[in-house]
Regions:
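Short strand-coil-strand connectors
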Residues: 42-45, 121
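Vicinal oxygen chelate
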Residues: 2, 66, 75-134
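Helix-adjacent hinge/juxtasegments
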Residues: 53-80
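Conserved active-site alpha-helix within GNAT-family acetyltransferase domains
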Residues: 17-26, 116
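Short glycine/proline-centered loop/turn elements that form peptide/ligand docking sites
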Residues: 18, 36-39
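Residue-level structural signal for beta-strand termini and adjacent loop
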Residues: 37, 53-54, 131
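Short secondary-structure junctions
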Residues: 28-34, 85-87
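N-terminal beta-strand motif that seeds the catalytic metal site of vicinal oxygen chelate
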Residues: 1-20, 47, 61-64, 129-134
Length: 134
């Protein structure tokens, strides 16, 4: 049933104009639709929406991520646009210059992943990842 459905993510925002500017200026997205209190965006393999919410708090875990072919190039491009990457030094998760090497992955995704995380203008934790294929 759901395995055949397209996935869509919803992210809360306290300031929709600020969120729109972030996703446009920093990430290169333009909304395909808008309504009062909401913006809808489409990617190659999915979609996401940002909605006004005064009561919801941004998460402490990754709320949305993109798979990229070259994580270093993507990090450089996003940094050039003013995106700041998270740095972690935790058991099992350490970033170097914003990028973590993660061992183990789903078999179809390779043997591991190189990943990096950043926050949007509303505090939502977003990620990019590059599968490691042996």
């Amino acid at each position: 049933m759901l395995k055949d459905a397209k996935v869509a993510t919803r992210l809360p925002a306290k300031d929709l104009n600020r969120a729109r500017a972030f996703y446009s200026e920093k990430l290169g997205f333009e909304p395909v639709e808008q309504r009062e209190g909401g913006l809808r965006y489409v990617c190659v393999a999915g979609e996401f929406a940002i909605f006004v919410s005064a009561g919801m708090q941004s998460g402490t875990h990754t709320q949305m991520s993109w798979e990229v072919d070259n994580i270093e190039a993507t990090v450089r491009e996003l940094r050039a646009r003013g995106v700041e990457f998270e740095e972690y030094d935790l058991p099992g998760l350490r970033t170097i210059d914003g990028i973590a090497e993660i061992r183990g992955n789903y078999p179809s995704k390779g043997t591991g992943e190189r990943a990096a995380w950043f926050r949007d203008s509303e505090g939502n934790l977003l990620g990019i990842g590059q599968p490691v294929r042996s």
